[in-house]
Amino acid sequence: MKSAVGLVAFATVFALPALADEVAPSDVMFNDGVVEASLTGKAGDATAGRDVFANRKLGNCLACHANSEMPEQSFHGEVAPLLDGVADRWEEAQLRGIVANAKMTFEDTMMPAFYIDSGYVRPLDGFESKSILTAQQVEDVVAYLMTLKEE
């Protein structure tokens, strides 16, 4: 029993600093759609971001966007802009704002806000007050998008 309590205490002490750096969805600071500061206080992982981008149950970005960097993925969307060279067109802070809540940049967009926890309709009660992506997943997707440059 002592070791279980000690393990929980240890995990709590080391997990809290990581959570303390994370910006809650309601606290994200947008400046004309731009989010300058990382949502997590650390750099995103482009490889993990690629996985989130392609995952039909997470980002599902390919439902709307085409991306020729992912030829192994089928059924790229044609509704939203092609993402080839997106890192040449937008800065990291702009992409962070677009992924977090595209409506702050493009008022009439159909793109979902991936990092908000209110002001939307969720089809299942279990998803109320929850963002689609975590702060880390947003940072990871942004890191991945920053790799998409023209050749």
What are these regions (language model features)?
Residues 15-17:
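N-terminal signal peptide c-region/cleavage motif recognized by signal peptidases
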Residues 58, 101-105:
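Glycine-rich, acidic and aromatic/proline-enriched surface loops and short helix-turn segments
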Residues 2-9, 13:
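Sec-dependent signal peptide recognition
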Residues 66-101, 110-124:
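Gly/Gly-Pro-rich "capping" loops immediately C-terminal to redox-active cysteine motifs
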Residues 97, 114-151:
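C-terminal capping alpha-helices of c-type cytochrome domains
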Residues 47-62, 72-77, 130-136:
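Sequence context surrounding c-type heme c attachment/ligation sites in exported
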Residues 22-56:
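Electrostatic cytochrome c docking/interface patches
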Residues 49, 57-68, 95, 111, ...:
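The canonical Cys-X-X-Cys-His
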